[in-house]
C-alpha cells in the first residue's frame, strides 16, 4: 500500500522541477531583447527592456564584451554608436554604418543579484556587387551557340543569379558559390548557353542578382548580341496599281545582317539582267503594256543571296477629265447659286408687298384736300370690289 501512496508525491515534485513549471513564477528582473538583421552600411537599433530594474542600470556590450553604454553613459568611443533611449526600464542604442565585422551576439546586462543577461544576435547582410558578363567576343552566325558567364562578389549569404533574353527566361547552370578572401562574403557565378537565331540580332541578354539585401531593387548587367544571317527581300510597287503611261518604281526591300550590298533585277524571258546596282529600285519612266511580266530582284550580302519575285500587270490608262468640262461644271455651280439667291429675294419681296397692300386710288385719295369725300370714295370703291356686280368708278 506504501508504493501507490507515494506516486502522487513524486508527480508533484516532477512538475515543480519541470521547465514549464519554472515559467509559472516569472522573473520580472530578467531583461529581454530581439535579434536584428541589417544591411551592410545601414543602421541597427538594439533595444533592451526590463520590468523590475531593482534600482540597477541596464548595460549593452558588443561581441568582444566591450561595454558600449551603461545607462546613459557612453563607454566606448565610437561615433557610430549613439544613445536612443535610457530609462530605468529600457536602454536602446543605435549603430550606424554597420560593417560585416559588427556581426555577432550583443549582450544586455542588469547588475542585480544575481546578474541577469539577454542576448541579441545581429546579422549583417553583404550586398552583392553588380554582376559582370564575360564570354561574348564578337558577332555570331545564325544557328551558332552563344555561351555567356556571369559573376558577382560580396554577397552574404550567397546570392542567386538569373538569366533572361528580352522577356524570355533562360535556364543557366546551377549557381556556383565560392567564399571570398575576407571569409565573410561569397562570389557567385553562372553560365548559360543557347543557339542564336536571326530574331536574336540586337537582343539583350541580362544577368540579374537576387538577394534579400537588395529589397526588390534591380541589380543586373546586360550584353547585347549581334547575329549575322542571310538576307531576305520583298518587292513593293509604287503606285500599287500601275497604269499605262504612268511612272512606276519597283522597290526591292532587302533585310539582313549585314544589309544587302548588291541588287540584281531580271525579267523572266529576257537576257541579260535589267539592272545591277547598289540601289534597290527599278524605275519605269513611262509604262507600256509590253512592260507586263514577272520581275525578280536578287539581294546579295556576304552571308548569301535571296531572290524575290513580282508579277507586273499594266492596266489601261484611266480616263482623265478635260479641263473644259471641269470649267463648265464650276460655272454651272455658280449660276445655280445665283438663281437660288434670286428666288430667295423674290420670296421676301412678295411677302413684303402682301403685308403692305395698297392701290393707286388709296394713296391719291388720302392725299387730297377733301379727305372725307376721299374716304367715302375709298369705302365705296372697296364696297364695289366686294359686290362684284355693281362696279363703279369714282373720279376725285
From Swiss-Prot:
GO terms for biological process: heterophilic cell-cell adhesion via plasma membrane cell adhesion molecules; homophilic cell adhesion via plasma membrane adhesion molecules; protein localization; synaptic membrane adhesion. Residues 128-226, 231-313 form the Ig-like C2-type domain. It comes from the Eukaryota. The modification Phosphoserine is found at residue 386. PROSITE patterns: IG_LIKE (PS50835). The chain crosses the membrane at residues 329-349. Homodimer. Can form trans-heterodimers with NECTIN3. Interacts with EPB41L1, DLG3, PALS2 and CASK. This is Cell adhesion molecule 3.
Amino acid at each position: 500500500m506504501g508504493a501507490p501512496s507515494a506516486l502522487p508525491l513524486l508527480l508533484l515534485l516532477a512538475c515543480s522541477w519541470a521547465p514549464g513549471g519554472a515559467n509559472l513564477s516569472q522573473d520580472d528582473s530578467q531583461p529581454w531583447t530581439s535579434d536584428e538583421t541589417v544591411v551592410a552600411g545601414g543602421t541597427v537599433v538594439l533595444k533592451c527592456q526590463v520590468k523590475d530594474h531593482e534600482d540597477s542600470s541596464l548595460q549593452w556590450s558588443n561581441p568582444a564584451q566591450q561595454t558600449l553604454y551603461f545607462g546613459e553613459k557612453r563607454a566606448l568611443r565610437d561615433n557610430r554608436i549613439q544613445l536612443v533611449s535610457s530609462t530605468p526600464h529600457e536602454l536602446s542604442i543605435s549603430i550606424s554604418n554597420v560593417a560585416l565585422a559588427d556581426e555577432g551576439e550583443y549582450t544586455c546586462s542588469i547588475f542585480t543579484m544575481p546578474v541577469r543577461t539577454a542576448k541579441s544576435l545581429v546579422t549583417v547582410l553583404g550586398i552583392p556587387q553588380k554582376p559582370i558578363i564575360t564570354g561574348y567576343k564578337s558577332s555570331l552566325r545564325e544557328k551558332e551557340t552563344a555561351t555567356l558567364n556571369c559573376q558577382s562578389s560580396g554577397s552574404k549569404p550567397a546570392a542567386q543569379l538569373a538569366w533572361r533574353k528580352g522577356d524570355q527566361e533562360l535556364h543557366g547552370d546551377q549557381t556556383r558559390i565560392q567564399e571570398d578572401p575576407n571569409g565573410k562574403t561569397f562570389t557567385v557565378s553562372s553560365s548559360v548557353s543557347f543557339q542564336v537565331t536571326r530574331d536574336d540580332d540586337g537582343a539583350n541578354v541580362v544577368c540579374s542578382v537576387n538577394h534579400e539585401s537588395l529589397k526588390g531593387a534591380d541589380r543586373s548587367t546586360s550584353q547585347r548580341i549581334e547575329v549575322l544571317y542571310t538576307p531576305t527581300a520583298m518587292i513593293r510597287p509604287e503606285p500599287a496599281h500601275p497604269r499605262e503611261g504612268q511612272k512606276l518604281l519597283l522597290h526591292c526591300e532587302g533585310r539582313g545582317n549585314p544589309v544587302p550590298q548588291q541588287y540584281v533585277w531580271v525579267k523572266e524571258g529576257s537576257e541579260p539582267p535589267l539592272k545591277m546596282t547598289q540601289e534597290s529600285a527599278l524605275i519605269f519612266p513611262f509604262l507600256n503594256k509590253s512592260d507586263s511580266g514577272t520581275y525578280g530582284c536578287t539581294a546579295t550580302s556576304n552571308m548569301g543571296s535571296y531572290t524575290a519575285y513580282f508579277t507586273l500587270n499594266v492596266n489601261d490608262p484611266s480616263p482623265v477629265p478635260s479641263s473644259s468640262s471641269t470649267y463648265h461644271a464650276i460655272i454651272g455651280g455658280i449660276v445655280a447659286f445665283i438663281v437660288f439667291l434670286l428666288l430667295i429675294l423674290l420670296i421676301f419681296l412678295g411677302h413684303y408687298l402682301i403685308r403692305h397692300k395698297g392701290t393707286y386710288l388709296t394713296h391719291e385719295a388720302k392725299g387730297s384736300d377733301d379727305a372725307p369725300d376721299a374716304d367715302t370714295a375709298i369705302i365705296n370703291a372697296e364696297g364695289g370690289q366686294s359686290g362684284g356686280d355693281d362696279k363703279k368708278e369714282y373720279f376725285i
